[in-house]
Regions:
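Extended hydrophobic leader/signal-anchor segments used for secretion and membrane insertion
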Residues: 1-482
Length: 482
């Protein structure tokens, strides 16, 4: 009698567990709008109620089988849980470079929310958890490209807002050399740079400033082809030329300084949107030419937030990235600083678009209209280089220009184009030391990964061990970093 009561009580508990799990699972399916997941419901029912499938058969075994399978079971469960959580809710991201300093620092570990902008349904769902694109040590792909699902984003808490710090997939990372030392390089920039050198050596280099738009297009096609063919002919040096799907490209983090439909222009380092100046981040950095009377004191560097990387740049080139606060402090230090001034010769070459001459610099750029979903733009040979990548690569159209300069999209003469996606303009706060939209263009909406919420760990690469922990940054909310 007692055993029967216990059995009945146990079944009630199992039914309660099943009801809770089923309700949560159905809510999840409603959220992601995927009723295909209903095929899992019978298995959930079996786990809690019918128990027809002996899910944990290994518990009946003796010896090493039971021990090994218990660890395998725990490991598989952990990997599946991590995969699911990283895909739909949040993931960890570490700041690898100084492009957002001094807002986010090298060595900051971020809690990145997928729910803020809505998680993407994965394009390549079959991937090894905790990897982005490559298995460590063996240097092979950590994912398979079948099945490949089209872009779709689940409803989130909101949209990307102006001046948000955003994690996204690197737009120019669709094609790369798989030799490890070149994987982080911009493949398109490599092709144009190498091609330019080849044409110069062959006496075929031209002054692009005097060419009309159609002549420029043909010339840059020749430059790109020369560079790509050279890279393809040197697999021992560069490896194979490979492609990566959107969700397997490197993760970048920058600040969104331009939204879909806005016209962006940079004038004397200030970003203007639709003619109005956008507020600079509090800790924005520019590089300064500086001449010292002696050695730079380490204590002063720590006080002003100047890193070893910053000092190395100064020792190599005579320029140093500084916030306004650091600049004013050094300018006032007459005993140390002989002269200091803004670097007006900051990096200017190799700007987007790579296949046209614009005369723009990283401090004076544009204007460019940022594409907005459903909006159209009149196409001509002058603005085509700016929007060609959006039309061809990100939105999957066939685009050609004939010998007369006529533009054809999917075989039809095109005078205009209507965009299918929203696009964003991303820049680092370290304005003279950031590879961003000025160099590789727009960020499509399907590349948006998530929003950093807070810094859960921070360790300075300049100070090893316990002394490098930045206690004052732990659990700081990223939205408070303006």
């Amino acid at each position: 009698m007692i055993d029967k009561q216990k059995q009945n009580l146990n079944m009630k508990v199992q039914w309660a567990k099943f009801a809770v799990v089923l309700a949560l699972y159905l809510l999840f399916l409603i959220w992601v709008e995927s009723w295909l997941g209903l095929i899992v419901v019978p298995f959930i029912f079996d786990v809690y109620i019918t128990k027809k499938i002996h899910w944990q058969w290994w518990k009946d075994e003796e010896g090493p089988v039971r021990f090994i399978m218990s660890w395998v079971d725990a490991l598989v469960f952990a990997l599946v849980a991590v995969y699911f959580i990283n895909l739909f809710f949040f993931q960890n991201y570490v700041i690898p470079s100084s492009s957002l300093e001094k807002s986010l620092l090298t060595g900051d570990y971020l809690f990145v929310s997928k729910v803020s902008y809505g998680p993407r349904i994965p394009e390549t769902p079959l991937t090894m958890p905790l990897t982005q694109h490559t298995l460590p040590l063996v240097n092979v792909k950590s994912y398979v490209e079948w099945p490949h699902w089209d872009y779709r984003r689940v409803k989130g808490l909101g949209n990307v807002k102006l001046n948000d710090i955003v994690v996204f997939n690197y737009p120019a990372g669709d094609t790369l050399c798989n030799e490890e030392r070149y994987q982080a390089n911009d493949f398109y920039l490599m092709c144009y740079s190498i091609g330019d050198q080849i044409l110069e050596q062959n006496g075929q280099q031209q002054d692009i400033r005097v060419l009309n738009p159609l002549q420029q297009r043909r010339y840059f096609e020749k430059v790109y082809a020369a560079g790509r063919n050279y890279i393809a002919s040197m697999p021992g040096e560069y490896g194979d030329i490979i492609s990566r799907p959107t969700d397997r490209r490197e993760n970048y983090v920058k600040r969104c300084v331009g939204l879909p439909g806005q016209t962006l222009q940079i004038k004397n380092r200030i970003v203007y949107l639709d003619g109005k100046a956008n507020k600079e981040p509090d800790n924005v950095q520019y590089t300064y030419k500086m001449k010292l009377k002696g050695e730079f004191p380490i204590e002063l560097a720590d006080e002003l937030g100047i890193t070893n990387e910053d000092l190395l740049m100064y020792n190599q080139s005579g320029v140093i990235p500084l916030t306004k606060k650091a600049y004013l402090a050094l300018k006032a230090n007459k005993n140390l600083v002989e002269s200091i001034s803004i670097n007006t010769d900051a990096r200017y070459g190799d700007l987007y678009p790579l296949n046209a001459y614009t005369g723009w610099t990283c401090d004076n750029y544009g204007p460019v209209w940022i594409p907005k979903k459903g909006k159209s733009i009149q196409l001509n040979l002058k603005n085509l280089p700016i929007y060609e990548r959006c039309i061809k690569v990100y939105e999957g159209n066939d685009l050609k220009v004939d010998s007369q300069g006529n533009i054809f999209i999917n075989g039809k003469l095109a005078k205009s184009y209507t965009f299918k996606l929203d696009y964003y303009w991303m820049m680092g706060d370290n304005r003279h030391n950031s590879a961003d939209s000025r160099y590789w263009g727009f960020v499509p909406e399907d590349h948006i990964v998530g929003k950093p919420i807070f810094i859960w760990w921070s360790h300075s690469p300049d100070h090893p061990g316990f002394s490098g922990i930045r206690w004052n940054r732990l659990f700081n909310f990223v939205d408070n970093i303006k």
